[in-house]
Amino acid sequence: MSEQQFRGPSLRILYDPQRVTAVSPEWLDPGFWRLRGGVTAELGGRGQALQLDTPAGPAVLRRYLRGGMVARVSHDRYFFTGYSRSRAFIEWSALSRLLERGLPVPRPLMASCERRGPYYRAGILTELIPGARSLADAAGVLGEDDWHRLGAMLQRFFAAGMVHADLNAHNILLDAAGRWYLIDFDRARVLDRPARPDRMLQRLFRSFDKLGIEGRRDLLVA
């Protein structure tokens, strides 16, 4: 995929010039879209992802927000160690590499890192997967073929070197055509060798237990 970078005094924005023809930092600001009625759904999660109607097409905006006790001190600031090492730029890189390897992930449209003193704030805008619902919502109506295809998809990701930091039933999507996708690659890594799936699958199955999903776990393990 194409990639260009906008550089400001304390701001860097990665963007796809094939989809985003005019770069504006406001596109990464939830308030900008709320004021203009561009928010079509609130998708929840700690980052409170927003589904948007943008000039680049339907998209999902997610700001990087902290959780736990540290959020009481700083809910959206991280120590700055370089633009390329920001959460948004690392996620952009992971998505780009996975797309190059033909894997089903949302296409990144924009990613920003804004430095403020020793800290930074960041956000990412990705293409919306139309008509998709999460595995958490769809698990009860899946057939054996669906579980087979999900298992095959996960094995493709593992073989491609993907290390997902939060593999759970909410981060796996099924679209209207029956295609599976993975989302939310914050803190993900893409290795130059196959990844060990054990811990990722353990995390996924813990989310199954929490949500009361039984499913065909045996079909998700190689």
Q: Predicted segments — roles?
A:
Residues P25-A132, Q155, A159-A160:
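Conserved ATP-binding subdomain of kinase catalytic cores across diverse folds
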Residues M1-T40:
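Juxta-kinase regulatory segment immediately upstream of eukaryotic protein kinase catalytic domains
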Residues L167-L174:
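Hydrophobic residue at the +6 position relative to the catalytic HRD Asp in the kinase catalytic loop
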Residues I90, R149, R203:
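Charged catalytic carboxylate motif
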Residues R133-L142:
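AlphaC helix of the protein kinase catalytic domain
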Residues D145-M153:
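Conserved alphaE helix
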Residues G161, D166, D184:
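Conserved catalytic-loop position in the HRD/HxD motif
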Residues D175, R179-A222:
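C-lobe/activation-segment region of protein kinase-like
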